[in-house]
Amino acid sequence: YSVGNEIQEIGTERGAEINRMLCNAFKELDATRFTTNGMNALNAVGAKVYPVMQELAPLIRKDAGEAGTNDNSGSNAINSFMKLMEGEAGDAFAVHPIVTEVLEESSESMDIIGFNYLTGRHLLEGELHPNKCVLGTETFPADIARLWKVVNSSKRVLGDFTWTGYDYLGEAGCGIFYYDGKSNFGSNYPDRT
């Protein structure tokens, strides 16, 4: 049973407590099924993301191909956040000690630790929780080839779910994908009307 997906409060003391209560409730009702939760560390770390971004700024700029820019406003700020979900900067974010601290209590409650966009964390979890399995609950299509190597190299990683409806018609929100060079994951005219 999945007790949630990208719940912001999962990284708080109260959120971890609720996660534990839900996992325990499912176990009481049906002890034959495993529990999981699709945790997104970018959501879970909250305001703690800023010191992490400061520390990872060189990797974020390298991944973005913007080594000379220090502009953290507007779309640059959004792009910096998005870089924490993919590539080298995403992997460094995934294993950052602050992320580990924030996710630890909730990870302990579930049977299978579920991660959204945290490919770099899958192998670390084998060390932190050797008696648990990991499941990728959301991954970008561009990362799936790299991720699949991780899945195949570890007996603790069960597999992964990736976005397959990447550019499906009818997307009304931030999932809009453009092939003509426009910024992805934001709505451009006429989609925004």
Predicted feature locations:
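Extended substrate-binding grooves/exosites of carbohydrate-active enzymes
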Residues: Y1-T193
